[in-house]
Design a protein with these regions (language model features):
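Short glycine/acidic-enriched loop and turn motifs that connect beta-strands
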Residues: 43-47, 93-97, 142-145, 191-195, ...
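Post-signal peptide N-terminal segment of secreted/secretory-pathway proteins
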Residues: 55-148
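Loop/turn-rich, solvent-exposed surfaces of beta-rich toroidal or solenoidal domains
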Residues: 299-367, 371
Length: 407
């Protein structure tokens, strides 16, 4: 069984049962309220364990640190998925917590726990992709299955077996997928027992699943550039479509742990008229490891997270091997950058501290990009305005900030 380290750099077998919440009438989950949902993480000294907390607040305060007194404790480095006013918390490391559904009430600005879906221990349910109001895909990283559930009732309605697509072991390690034109594109990380890509399988594999039939139509692979580990199971923005509906997938490679292989970057599945004609286009792939980060002397050793801004621009966290001092799990080796897919440039964003590999969240708040940071001297959320190039701290937190959403 793989006890994967995906969630500390990004993320992070067996029958499945499900049940409704034990309480017939849902009750508010905590006393906190507000229109901003924030998750923070307190790491133990080894960087491999700790505690995470989810809470609402109205106070974006860069002076007084947000504590966890009115927070819900969630599994360490758990995932959070939001659809409208539905909030899903997933146990991305273990699985015993399962998938918890919360409902946000805009009138009271509070969260109420609604229902729970039980998953096997160590199955690693990292993300939930809604197909419709009554159907969602729940890929399991450590089990070679994609569960199909009804997100309204939180009941299982089916499953897709993907074991046959695994390389050298029992699970192909499902990543974070995306739906385009009625098909679910599901990247497979294909990691070995050492938590790294197989040396004889340095490529990116993606399953194409018909969302009407739940059948795998085909598997496609990008083998030219040797970019591996496509997507991160807990990060929605690591896979995206451009204005032309081309799918780009972030590839972390060896997370910078292998000095002999720092290949990382992006692979592309262009828009196509038919599934049979759908393939990767290696001419649109980009290995960023040889590109100097403008404003520094470093080149990326891996890429942690990404947020597509439009017109070929991406806000991202990349790592520099030169910043690894003692423990790569807690070293401040993450650099906030602006990537241009068209010009093939990477530029450091000034004003955002270097962070560790846990706190590398990137999201949006209106026209601003929000970065979650756990720096040497500052922790919290930092905003970046792509139009002006101005960045600033908008929230001070006691723990490292690794999720943000504005209702």
């Amino acid at each position: 069984m793989k006890r994967v380290i995906l969630t500390f750099c990004s993320l992070a077998l067996l029958s499945v049962s499900c049940k409704k919440d034990d309480t017939p009438t849902p009750t508010p989950s905590n006393e906190g309220s507000g229109k901003y949902l924030v998750k923070t993480t307190f790491k133990n000294p080894d960087g491999k364990s700790g505690s995470s907390y989810l809470q609402l607040t109205n106070d974006l305060n860069a002076t007084t640190a947000l504590n966890n007194k009115q927070a819900i404790q969630v599994p360490y480095m758990s995932s959070v998925m939001i659809y409208g006013n539905e909030v899903y918390s997933l146990d991305a490391i273990d699985g015993s917590y399962g998938v918890r559904k919360f409902i946000y009430n805009p009138a009271t600005q509070k969260l109420t726990e609604s229902k729970k879906f039980d998953t096997p221990a160590h199955s690693m349910p990292c993300n939930l992709i809604k197909v419709s109001d009554t159907k969602a895909y729940l890929p399991l990283y450590n089990v070679p299955k994609v569960l199909i559930i009804n997100p309204q009732t939180m009941q299982k309605t089916g499953e897709i077996d993907i074991q046959r697509y695994a390389h050298s072991d029992s699970s192909p390690d499902a990543g974070y997928g995306i739906i385009r034109d009625g098909y679910f594109y599901l990247p497979l990380l294909q990691l070995g027992p050492d938590y790294a890509p197989f040396a004889d399988h340095l490529q990116s594999d993606v399953l194409i699943i018909n969302v009407q039939t739940d059948k795998v139509e085909k598997i496609i692979s990008e083998t030219t550039t040797h970019l591996a580990m496509p997507s991160q199971p807990s990060y929605k923005t690591c896979i995206f479509t451009t204005e032309n509906k081309d799918i780009y997938i972030m590839c972390a490679g060896y997370f910078g742990f292998n000095p002999a292989n720092t290949h990382s970057g992006f692979v592309c599945i262009p828009q196509s008229t038919t599934v049979s004609a759908t393939e990767f286009d290696s001419s649109k792939s980009w290995d960023i490891s040889n590109t100097t980060i403008e404003g520094t002397t470093y080149k990326p050793s891996t890429i942690y997270s990404a947020e597509y801004l439009g017109n070929g621009r991406i806000a991202a966290f990349v790592a520099a091997a030169e910043l690894n001092i003692d423990n790569p799990f807690i070293d401040k080796n993450g650099i906030a950058v602006l990537i241009d897919l068209n010009a093939k440039t990477i530029k450091k964003i000034d004003g955002i501290p270097y962070t560790d590999s846990h706190s590398v969240f990137i999201g949006r708040n209106n026209n601003e990009v929000i970065f979650g940071v756990s720096g040497k001297e500052k922790r919290g959320l930092f905003s970046y305005d792509p139009a002006t190039g101005i960045s600033k701290q908008v929230l001070n937190t006691e723990g490292g900030a690794d999720f943000f959403y504005a209702f």
